[in-house]
């Protein structure tokens, strides 16, 4: 039999929801997993179900492009976004991430190197490519100095 502490239950503050993050094809950085992969079922505004994992971006950099209109012409502004100790919910929407991350389980506390390698395509396939390695393995092969 369980005894529930209703006072503590009403005072309990669950961890706040983190902003979703889908790394771009030029993202390079190291993340630390704060938990394991979990499944989020499709809701009204979502295209499909998605697998996610809460992470802390220890260090990373990504190019951001912003399109705007100036004097009737469309222009693009490019800037570098740097990440440091930011907590996000990593979406495993990209097939390479969805395939690679479970092979690194258990994830909690694990540091993972991610680097976008651009779009890959061939006769019968098209996908976004990423390098996904444990931080220690990335150091061994010289991807991190």
Where do the protein language model's features map onto the residues?
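OB-fold ssDNA-binding interfaces and closely related basic DNA-contact patches used
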Residues: 1-82
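OB-fold and OB-like beta-barrel modules that bind single-stranded nucleic acids
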Residues: 29-35, 109-117
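A short, sequence-level motif marking secondary-structure junctions
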Residues: 36, 74-75, 91-98
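Intrinsically disordered, low-complexity regulatory regions enriched in Ser/Pro/Gly/Thr
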Residues: 47-49, 104-108, 124
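Short, basic/aromatic beta-hairpin or loop at an interaction surface
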Residues: 78-92
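Short nucleic-acid-contacting surface segments enriched for D/E, G, S/T with interspersed K/R
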Residues: 95-114
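OB-fold/S1-family single-stranded nucleic acid-binding modules
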Residues: 115-145
């Amino acid at each position: 039999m369980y005894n529930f502490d209703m006072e503590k239950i009403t005072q309990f503050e669950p961890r706040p929801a983190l902003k979703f993050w889908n790394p771009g094809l030029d993202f390079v950085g190291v993340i630390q997993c704060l938990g394991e992969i979990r499944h989020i079922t499709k809701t009204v505004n979502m295209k499909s179900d998605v697998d996610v994992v809460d992470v802390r971006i220890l260090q990373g950099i990504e190019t951001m492009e912003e399109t705007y209109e100036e004097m009737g012409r469309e222009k693009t502004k490019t800037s570098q976004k740097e990440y440091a100790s930011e907590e996000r919910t990593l979406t495993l929407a990209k097939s390479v991430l969805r395939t690679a991350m479970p092979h690194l389980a258990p994830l909690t506390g694990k540091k993972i190197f991610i680097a976008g390698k651009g779009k890959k395509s061939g006769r019968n396939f098209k996908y976004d490519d990423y390098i996904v390695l444990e931080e220690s393995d990335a150091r061994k092969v010289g991807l991190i100095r």
